[in-house]
Amino acid sequence: MTERQSSFSYNDLIDSSNGKMWGPDNAQLPAPPMLMMDRITHIDDETGEHGKGQIVAELDIKPDLWFFDCHFKGDPVMPGCLGLDAMWQLVGFFLCWKGNPGKGRALGVGEVKFTGQITPDCKKVRYVIDLKRVIQRRLIMAIGDGRVEVDGKTIYTAKDLRVGLFKPGEMA
C-alpha cells in the first residue's frame, strides 16, 4: 500500500493551483486570492465524525487580505461565501488525494448556518470537513459536513457539502 501525504504546505497548495499536483485534466485548487487556505494540516480517509475521512486546513488572517477593503467599507468582514467555498475546495481536494481523476465542481450544499464572523482582528481560521460518503464509480462525488472556526470558536456550519469530479466533455 502506498503511503499518501497527510499534510500540505502553502507551496504544495500553489502547485495544486498550477495543475502540478494531480496532472493535466484533473482538479486544481484555485489560485490566490481565491485560494482560501494557507495549509492543510491533516487529511485521512479513516477518521472523522462518520469514519469516512477528515480534512483540516488553516488560513492565517492578516488585516490586509483583499476582501476586507471591499466587504464592507468601514465594516470589514470576510464574506461568508468565501468560507463556504473553502469547504468545497477541501472536499474536491480530498477526492483528488484519493486518486480520482477529473476536474472538481461544487454541486451543492444541504444547509449552511452562520453564527459569527471573521474580521481583521481575528488570527486564524480553521476549516474541518468530515466526509460522510465517497462515491468512486462512474460518478465521482464526495459528501461531507464542514465547519469554519475562528480563533477556536465555530462560526459557520455546512451540512451535505457536495463536490464532483468530471472528465472533459462531461461538464455542460
UniProtKB/Swiss-Prot annotation:
InterPro entries: FabA, FabA_FabZ, HotDog_dom_sf. This is 3-hydroxydecanoyl-[acyl-carrier-protein] dehydratase. Keywords: Cytoplasm, Fatty acid biosynthesis, Fatty acid metabolism, Isomerase, Lipid biosynthesis, Lipid metabolism, Lyase. The keyword Isomerase applies. Signal peptide: none annotated. Transmembrane segments: none annotated. PANTHER family: 3-HYDROXYACYL-[ACYL-CARRIER-PROTEIN] DEHYDRATASE, 3-HYDROXYDECANOYL-[ACYL-CARRIER-PROTEIN] DEHYDRATASE. Homodimer. It catalyses: a (3R)-hydroxyacyl-[ACP] = a (2E)-enoyl-[ACP] + H2O; (3R)-hydroxydecanoyl-[ACP] = (2E)-decenoyl-[ACP] + H2O; (2E)-decenoyl-[ACP] = (3Z)-decenoyl-[ACP]. The active site is at residue 71. It comes from Maricaulis maris (strain MCS10). It holds the Pfam family FabA. Its main location: cytoplasm. GO terms for cellular component: cytoplasm. The lineage of its organism: Bacteria, Pseudomonadati, Pseudomonadota, Alphaproteobacteria, Maricaulales. The keyword Signal does not apply. The gene is fabA.
